[in-house]
Amino acid sequence: MGRAGAAAVIPGLALLWAVGLGSAAPSPPRLRLSFQELQAWHGLQTFSLERTCCYQALLVDEERGRLFVGAENHVASLNLDNISKRAKKLAWPAPVEWREECNWAGKDIGTECMNFVKLLHAYNRTHLLACGTGAFHPTCAFVEVGHRAEEPVLRLDPGRIEDGKGKSPYDPRHRAASVLVGEELYSGVAADLMGRDFTIFRSLGQRPSLRTEPHDSRWLNEPKFVKVFWIPESENPDDDKIYFFFRETAVEAAPALGRLSVSRVGQICRNDVGGQRSLVNKWTTFLKARLVCSVPGVEGDTHFDQLQDVFLLSSRDHRTPLLYAVFSTSSSIFQGSAVCVYSMNDVRRAFLGPFAHKEGPMHQWVSYQGRVPYPRPGMCPSKTFGTFSSTKDFPDDVIQFARNHPLMYNSVLPTGGRPLFLQVGANYTFTQIAADRVAAADGHYDVLFIGTDVGTVLKVISVPKGSRPSAEGLLLEELHVFEDSAAVTSMQISSKRHQLYVASRSAVAQIALHRCAAHGRVCTECCLARDPYCAWDGVACTRFQPSAKRRFRRQDVRNGDPSTLCSGDSSRPALLEHKVFGVEGSSAFLECEPRSLQARVEWTFQRAGVTAHTQVLAEERTERTARGLLLRRLRRRDSGVYLCAAVEQGFTQPLRRLSLHVLSATQAERLARAEEAAPAAPPGPKLWYRDFLQLVEPGGGGSANSLRMCRPQPALQSLPLESRRKGRNRRTHAPEPRAERGPRSATHW
């Protein structure tokens, strides 16, 4: 079946290579912010209702300034600027008799027999279309939201409640995928209570209701619908198509490989009205193709088969948007997630290619070599591509061919032939994606926000890779937006307000698209961040405004090289030298933690009286940690100046300058006895050895920011580091009470 076709049949050849890829460490973010940090310093807002879960449907209304949320038994209307203020809620529970029927059918009365709102669409200027599971009795209603933003309204229209079959799923565990075009709703759902009859369904509007052929695995084979989009094909609205993204069990897989899940993109024509004698009230223009997201390897491709979400990023030409999709693996051996990018031209090219064909049960899937009837199956009836005005006018051989050949032979491959961004061996899986196109000083960049199943959002930027047209994804931030680490179930973005709205089972969160101040206080840190939202303005790292005519806007997203942009910058303060003291034979910890998790830390050492700097190498007595340098069994010759520097993007940035003074045990004891004997003194200048005495005295409260150390303890020298650290904190008896006294002047010494 060719490269793409073979991939469709055997998606898991490269097991050995996949295991090797799986052993690789996941890419770290440049900046990691906890829930507490986001809430305290970066404006994270959250919203939740009491005794309510499952916030799955999000709808951004920029005109009214509202975020509409569908949840268990509720629809909520939130303020787009701050979702925790001016919230309105509408209770919409399932009727008692429906809940009882649901319970009698064997469903859980507390977790399944509720009305889980799955769909929210803007129906007209005053109403929303909302659909929910209705305790396994799908139902839809029109919700009045008013005309103006100044007076938000949220009211259920009791006279416009209708059956939701074919619009909303029965089961709350099933995802809802739909799009409202005009007054027509296109949905991918299970149309029966048992969840076996999956269909692509059109309802509402003036055109007849249509569905896919039921119980035909060639059309749909246990699909899981993900997203639906309406994308124009030309200036003629008769050519408009609806694209469905889903995953299903592959019918083209070899029986020896078992049940294999693949990702698909399907298409239907919006003006399809079904066939005249065959495929009556069924789609006559339905086609599907495999959506491939894989990493090429020597032994074969490693596939990410589980499509999780798709985001359509509009371009100047509304016919050619970019499609950003997130995938995960289905293998229990190799686990990872990936982002692949697709162009609509490649999708259309696959649907204009050869059809997949199989002669019989014992035959292989091949490219169809016979005559394809006219008009070509999958083409819309319009004046653009033919003379047919309706699908009911299509010849019988066209309808019959469309019924038997819904699958295309060629797959849709990602731009660049490989994922834009992937994470292997991470403790999370990608679940959702949203994208924003940002104008920067050196061009336009796509910024991706990727939700995970552990309540985090990854901020990734797509940057050009060398001179080739392909791009690579750089992980800028990891944001913990949910305190309970609940999986991200939905995301919506407001480019106008620069806000991201994230939903989970437990809450809805709101976070800004940028946190420029978090990147650093100096020019180099701001430029190294490569955040297209941010630039150095000569004083601080602030929001970049493309229209601002400011002279000192420094930004380099493509290369992240501050050597030129920040060469004349005087914002970085002089690197002060901090005195640190240690006792011979004990341990000392020199703390130095770079702001960026992607930076490599280098330590150099300058011995007293020597001008040359030598690199501190890893050996038995030295251990590098994420927070600094640990020196064990200190010697007098360890005294000197230690310089900590961060290396990132080939740029070296000094961070700390620490002067270590190693004292003998005799000197330490003498200083301690002098401290005991010296009388109290009025407040005055603090001596250089006060910090040292606070460190060596038991319970002295030494600062962790400069040094962690202990007196020599021979009995503990052979123990592991953690044991020695615990030993320093143990006490076998209560400390003797000591009188409080203030610092003394140097005259007592």
Curated annotation (Swiss-Prot):
Keyword terms of this UniProt record: Disulfide bond, Endoplasmic reticulum, Glycoprotein, Immunoglobulin domain, Secreted, Signal
UniProt-annotated stretches for the region Disordered: 702-749
First-listed, main subcellular location of the protein, grouped into a coarse class: secreted
Keyword Endoplasmic reticulum in record: yes
Classification via Pfam families: ig, Sema
Single GO molecular function: semaphorin receptor binding
Residue ranges constituting the Sema domain according to the UniProt record: 30-513
Disulfide bonds: C102-C113, C131-C140, C269-C380, C293-C340, C516-C534, C644-C710
Record note on what altering R348C does: In a non-small cell lung cancer cell line
Positions annotated as glycosylated: N82, N124, N427
One term under GO cellular component: plasma membrane
Coiled coil: none
GO term, biological process aspect, one: semaphorin-plexin signaling pathway
Keyword Signal tagged: yes
Tissue specificity comment: Expressed abundantly but differentially in a variety of neural and nonneural tissues.
Domain of life the protein comes from: Eukaryota
Compartments where found: Secreted; Endoplasmic reticulum
SUPFAM superfamilies assigned to the protein according to its UniProt record, in alphabetical order: Immunoglobulin, Plexin repeat, Sema domain
Gene3D superfamilies reported for this sequence: Immunoglobulins (2.60.40.10), ligand-binding face of the semaphorins, domain 2 (3.30.1680.10), YVTN repeat-like/Quinoprotein amine dehydrogenase (2.130.10.10)
Basic and acidic residues bias (residue ranges): 733-743
Span of domain Ig-like C2-type: 573-659
Signal peptide location: 1-24
Function summary: Inhibits axonal extension by providing local signals to specify territories inaccessible for growing axons.
Similarity comment: Belongs to the semaphorin family.
Protein name, entry field: Semaphorin-3B
Organism: Homo sapiens (Human)
Gene that this sequence comes from: SEMA3B
